[in-house]
Amino acid sequence: MVRPSPLDPRKSPKQARSAATVEIILEAAARILESKGLPGYTTNAVAEKAGVSVGSLYQYFPGKDALTGALIRRETSVLMEEAEEAARDASGENALKRMIAAAVAHQLRRPALARILDFEEARWPDVQDIRRVKEKLMALLAEVLAMPDLPPQADREVAAADVLAMVRGMIDAAGEREEVERDDLERRVRRAVFGFLK
């Protein structure tokens, strides 16, 4: 029997009203993380901010970790949609530039939240859906690196993993420094990635 992850929700909303309640709870959690950080992030604080009872919160999320997992899934799904769209570009160079732009935008859209969720995600490296997202991103990158207008790589999977680590490392470091200048960060990441691929 597969044991549920501590990041799994208790139940999924079936009706539109329930889905709206879950979204309100998630947004309240995001705002608390942004304004109070992890020390102020409690289920009671989230319920109060969302305007729901703690019991209502616990209907969907058995605890803080499940709430955090749902936030990670929500934020990551936005990044994945943007990366998938970018990877469809006919030019490898443009696809890679657009993927970098999506990653930078993702970090800078809500930088405090992104920093905290990155930290929390690192606590759960073996959770299946987190691992699946990384694998999907690496597969997308490997496909882009195979495009004929980019320099050939001896091992595309290794190159994709290196590029992903480089992009994430630079963007996370910029987030830790609380950088907000999107164009400059994008330029630096592009320079590093394309320099590496030559």
Language model features by range: what are they?
Residues 84-86, 117-124:
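Short linear capping/connector segments at secondary-structure termini
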Residues 77-80, 97-101, 105-109, 124-150, ...:
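Amphipathic alpha-helical packing segments from all-alpha helical-bundle domains
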Residues 71-98:
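Amphipathic alpha-helical linker/stalk segments
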Residues 68-75, 117, 133:
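Alpha-helical DNA-contacting segments of helix-turn-helix folds
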Residues 143-147, 164-182, 194-198:
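Amphipathic C-terminal alpha-helical segment
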Residues 20, 24, 28, 32-66:
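Helix-turn-helix
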Residues 1-20:
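N-terminal intrinsically disordered/low-complexity leader segments
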Residues 25-33, 75, 79, 103, ...:
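Short hydrophobic clusters on alpha-helical segments that form packing/core surfaces
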